[in-house]
Design a protein with these regions (language model features):
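Juxtamembrane extracytoplasmic/periplasmic/luminal helical "stalk" adjacent to the first N-terminal
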Residues: 8, 15-79, 145
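Short, hydrophobic-rich beta-strand element in sensory/regulatory alpha-beta domains
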Residues: 64, 103-107, 197-198
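Amphipathic coiled-coil signal-relay and dimerization helices
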Residues: 75-76, 112-119, 206-210
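Solvent-exposed, extracytoplasmic
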Residues: 87-99, 176-234
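Core beta-strand residues in small-molecule sensory/regulatory alpha/beta domains
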Residues: 108, 167-168, 200
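Extracytoplasmic/periplasmic ligand-binding sensor regions of membrane-associated signaling proteins
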Residues: 117-189
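Extracellular/periplasmic juxtamembrane segments that couple receptor/chemosensory ectodomains to their
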Residues: 228-285
Length: 285
């Protein structure tokens, strides 16, 4: 699988419109001063948004590592299983998933096939599904652990996947355990703010958004290699990935930009808006 080509950095983005619009009525000097002060304030606010997102993920980061040491899971990946044993594994993962309040826990063998899963009772159960094409599976089998954000190929529900290799006493990789973290609750929290808050991946695809219409937009055009990769990994399923068209009118010293929204299929913004970006340290985006 080709390595993603990083465009600049992974970003969290925000648009503020009301405050900026009111500034234009002030004198040029006062407006510039107020704009820079507002931009600095937004940058601090962005740091809080990013911290909240990172904390939501870090809450689950150790669970796959703990489960990878579980003797029952290790044993299950070294021999054929009877139906009763598969049911026991399903119940074990279901219980662990309920205690952690994650989205899904799945046990996969070294071929990327799901042996057991916490959602085994569901009509869209992961059990028996082939996930070998997913990057978080390939990463864990090759490097010991992996991470990936995408739409679930079985459930159709997006989430952040953390994977951990399961090894025997000799260090041979037997399979992996995967936790899927749903971030929809975080997006609902963003709805409480008047700002437009976005998070984009290495390809410039907006995967989290405070407003539904902004999700799965492209901040930059994709090249053929990137489109092929997204198709192969089925990262965003059949989402059309329409471009987010903006015009930059001005750039500030701290990286902020004044922009106008040009995408006709999005709700219009009142005039120019303040666009701020910030990398998300500690995440794979």
């Amino acid at each position: 699988m080709p390595t993603p080509r990083l465009r600049q950095f992974w970003t969290l983005l925000i648009l503020l419109t009301g405050t900026v619009a009111s500034m234009f009525a002030a004198s040029q000097w006062a407006w510039q001063r107020s704009l820079h002060a507002e931009s600095d304030s937004v940058q601090r606010q962005l740091a809080l948004y990013g911290q909240t997102l990172a904390q939501r993920i870090d809450r689950y980061r150790t669970l796959p590592e703990v489960l990878a040491l579980d003797a029952q899971l290790q044993s299950a990946l070294q021999r054929p299983l009877r139906p009763a044993e598969v049911e026991q594994l399903n119940l074990k993962l279901e219980q662990a998933n309920g205690a952690s309040q994650s989205s899904t826990l799945t046990l996969l063998n070294s071929d990327g096939l799901a042996v057991a899963a916490s959602n085994w009772r569901s009509a869209t159960s992961n059990v028996g599904q082939d996930y070998s094409f997913r990057p978080y599976v390939q990463q864990a089998l090759a490097q010991g652990r992996g991470s990936f954000y995408g739409i679930g190929v079985t459930t159709g529900v997006p989430g952040y996947f953390l994977s951990q290799a399961i090894r025997d006493d000799h260090g041979h990789t037997l399979g992996l355990v995967v936790i899927k973290i749903a971030l929809q609750e975080l997006e609902r929290e963003w709805l409480q703010t008047p700002d437009i808050v976005l998070a984009s991946d290495a390809h410039g695809v907006v995967f989290l958004a405070s407003q539904d219409a902004w999700r799965y937009r492209l901040l930059e055009p994709l090249d053929d290699e990137e489109r092929s990769e997204l198709t192969a990994t089925r990262q965003y399923s059949d989402q059309p990935l329409r471009p987010l068209e903006l015009r930059v009118d001005d750039r500030l010293d701290n990286g902020g930009r004044l922009v106008r929204l040009l995408s006709a299929d999005l709700p219009p913004l009142p005039g120019r808006a303040l666009w701020q970006t910030q990398p998300l340290p500690g995440t794979p985006w």
